[in-house]
Amino acid sequence: MSAKPATDDAKDELLSPFRRLYALTRTPYPALANAALLASTPVLSPSFKVPPTQSPALSIPMSRVFSKSSTARIGITTKTALFFSTMQAIGAYMIYDNDLENGAGFIATWSALYLIVGGKKSFSALRYGRTWPLVLSSVSLANAVLYGQRFLATGFQ
């Protein structure tokens, strides 16, 4: 009988960091942290254009034919960073204004949208030694999961 409570205590200790993070979603602090990271991106890790690699003669990939720009970018642009930072700050204000359900849904949605826009680029930035986009994607993923769980746990009442 004493072995079972010991395993429950160990399980609680293992899950306690996740419970603490989930408890933080009652506050606007994780969203404000993400907004601050995104807003500081143009200063800490500005995006730059990567020159295209030379392809063999008469071999033009179709993605280059229909692409808007001829050079790829590493990292997110200043406009994108400030836009998503503003959206995170608006969601944080919603939670600060005691609208937990809508604020959590708003933050989860915009965090997921950031992952759609910048998630793949964050992995390609690793080839050029840039880890900041991966940090931003990781924090956005954590916000999307935690605030999304908070939003879905409300039961849509």
Swiss-Prot record:
The modification N-acetylserine is found at S2. The chain crosses the membrane at residues 31-48, 80-96, 103-119, 131-147. InterPro entries: AIM19. It is a multi-pass membrane protein. It holds the Pfam family Aim19. The keyword Hydrolase does not apply. Disruption phenotype: Increases frequency of mitochondrial genome loss. It is found in: Mitochondrion membrane. The keyword Transcription regulation does not apply. GO terms for cellular component: mitochondrial membrane; mitochondrion. Keywords: Acetylation, Membrane, Mitochondrion, Transmembrane, Transmembrane helix. Belongs to the AIM19 family. PANTHER family: ALTERED INHERITANCE OF MITOCHONDRIA PROTEIN 19, MITOCHONDRIAL. This is Altered inheritance of mitochondria protein 19, mitochondrial. The gene is AIM19.
